[in-house]
Amino acid sequence: MTHTDCPSLLSFRQADESDLLELVRLRDAAARWQIERGIRQWKPGELGRSHFEAILREGEAWIATLGDRGPTVGAWELWWDDLPAWGEQPPVAGYVHRLMTDRQTAPPGAGLVMLAEAERRIARSGRALCRLDCLSDNPRLRRYYEDAGYTVVGEQPSKNGDGGKQYGVTLLEKRLREQ
């Protein structure tokens, strides 16, 4: 199976409060997977239920499943501004955060399919850009996004992140076609 087989397999829905524990589970599992591979991006237990409750109030979280009723294969957050990384900006972009897949259920290429769905959601809202960031010292993730059509547009050396910690991030964006 290739990522081109994936679109017909995945369904997408906006997350609600009944999904909070699933979002935490996905995030923690993704963090453990990263650590096992020497990737310093996330830590298990770093973001809990209260984080995702805030996202549901202030932005959007999306769930991807195999078919309409199948198991969860991944999720992502969609924000309509991102002051910590991008500062004050005109409303021309959507910001994707915490793109994560379930390594037990996600078919190959599911991450790219979910990213494309996030891009469609942003384009349908009338915004022309999809923006995201990754740790400056994570070249593997940066390459993943560049291979998906994203361009590096800057560095933010001291992003104020979750829990008040500061870290450097690479800023990437992709111009979207109208949907």
What are these regions (language model features)?
Residues 115, 122-134:
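Conserved GNAT acetyl-CoA-binding A-motif
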Residues 23, 27:
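Hydrophobic "lid"/C-terminal helical patch
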Residues 111, 115, 137-141, 157-165:
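Short glycine/proline-centered loop/turn elements that form peptide/ligand docking sites
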Residues 22, 117, 121, 143-144:
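Structural preference for long, well-ordered alpha-helical segments within the folded cores
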Residues 131-134, 146-169:
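Conserved catalytic-core motifs of GNAT/GCN5-like acyltransferases
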Residues 1-18, 178-179:
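Conserved N-terminal entry element of GNAT/NAT acetyltransferase domains
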Residues 17, 28-106, 112-117, 121, ...:
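Acetyl-CoA-dependent GNAT
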